[in-house]
């Protein structure tokens, strides 16, 4: 079980030789290997990795020395140096890291992944549960609203800023990006401005791109039983209050589903619960435990009791 990149890690482990036979059922919360940032094709990661090695004074050749040196560098430093490896004229909010698993040669000692999860020749068959927050992409939008300069630039020149925020250069050829951005703007915004007045459209865009499309593709390409649920309940607290300037209205946003499983006193030390909060938490915990025990997701039903198919 994992959330966000942890959910993507769960999904990628389906294809990891070292994890074969270790699972009975799997749970991914807002994260699959098909999401951007969750898997890094080697063609995209070789040059940035060597640049990172130079920044931490590791040799880039031979590869054995490169790997041995990099393994001894504190992971915090590797993440902190990312902005120097992927520089942009526009500094985007730090909502995650671009470093992700990539394909390793089968000859490597204990390789994690030897095939691309997106094009794997076999289909795993573990019972798999996916849960998405209705406004998962709100996490990105909240950070944008918390950076006045970035918010202004996005409103003034979305064709310049959106490709950077979405890191389209990691997924598409540079020549195709202008047309892709035009289609994005036409589909989500039409003739409307891009900014606070179109918060819901921004949230839909970032939700679709970073979360929903990946889950849809992963589910359609899955070989076993897979269930996908959209979490819509808003607890009395939300991670929106901790992101950006705290003004984002869309919810439940990224990670909010965790608030129905865990109290999280670190982030919400004064949290209180309504009767409905408790009711939903009990439902979610019981349904999750049931799925973990027997792989049956049927206890995840809407609170109104409607049948889910």
Give residue spans per PLM region.
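Serine-hydrolase-like catalytic core of hydrolytic proteins
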Residues: 1-67, 72, 89, 103-106, ...
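Short, solvent-exposed turn/loop segments enriched in Gly/Ser/Thr/Pro and often Arg
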Residues: 4-5, 229-237, 303-309
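Sec/Tat-exported extracytoplasmic proteins
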Residues: 17, 56, 74, 192, ...
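Substrate-gating cap/lid region and adjacent catalytic-acid/histidine neighborhood
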Residues: 34, 69, 76-278, 287, ...
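Glycine-rich, phosphate-binding/catalytic loops in enzymes
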Residues: 44-45, 145-149, 300
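Surface-exposed helix-capping loop/turn segments at secondary-structure junctions
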Residues: 59-63, 222-227, 290-308
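C-terminal catalytic lobe of FAD-dependent flavoproteins
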Residues: 284
């Amino acid at each position: 079980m994992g959330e966000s990149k942890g959910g993507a890690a769960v999904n990628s482990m389906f294809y990891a030789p070292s994890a074969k036979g270790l699972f009975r059922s799997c749970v991914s919360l807002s994260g699959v290997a098909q999401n951007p940032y969750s898997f890094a094709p080697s063609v995209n990661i070789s040059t940035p990795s060597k640049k990172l090695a130079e920044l931490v004074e590791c040799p880039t050749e031979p590869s054995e020395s490169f790997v041995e040196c990099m393994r001894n560098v504190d992971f915090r430093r590797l993440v902190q140096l990312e902005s120097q490896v992927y520089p942009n004229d526009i500094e985007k909010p730090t909502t995650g890291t671009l470093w992700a698993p990539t394909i390793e040669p089968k000859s490597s000692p204990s390789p994690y992944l030897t095939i691309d999860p997106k094009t794997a020749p076999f289909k795993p068959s573990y019972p798999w549960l996916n849960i998405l927050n209705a406004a998962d992409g709100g996490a990105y939008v909240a950070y944008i609203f918390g950076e006045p300069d970035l918010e202004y630039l996005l409103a003034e020149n979305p064709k310049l800023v959106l490709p950077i925020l979405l890191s389209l250069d990691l997924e598409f050829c540079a020549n195709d990006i202008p047309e892709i951005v035009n289609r994005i703007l036409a589909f989500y915004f039409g003739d409307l401005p891009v900014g606070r007045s179109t918060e819901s459209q921004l949230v839909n865009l970032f939700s679709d791109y970073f979360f929903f499309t990946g889950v849809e593709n992963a589910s359609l390409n899955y070989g076993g039983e897979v269930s996908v649920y959209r979490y819509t309940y808003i607890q009395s607290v939300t991670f929106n209050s901790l992101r950006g300037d705290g003004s984002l209205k869309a919810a439940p946003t990224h990670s909010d589903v965790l608030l129905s499983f865990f109290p999280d006193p670190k982030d919400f030390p004064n949290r209180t619960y309504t009767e409905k909060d408790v009711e939903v938490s009990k439902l979610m915990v019981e349904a999750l435990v049931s799925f973990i025990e027997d792989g049956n997701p049927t206890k995840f039903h809407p609170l109104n009791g409607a049948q889910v198919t």
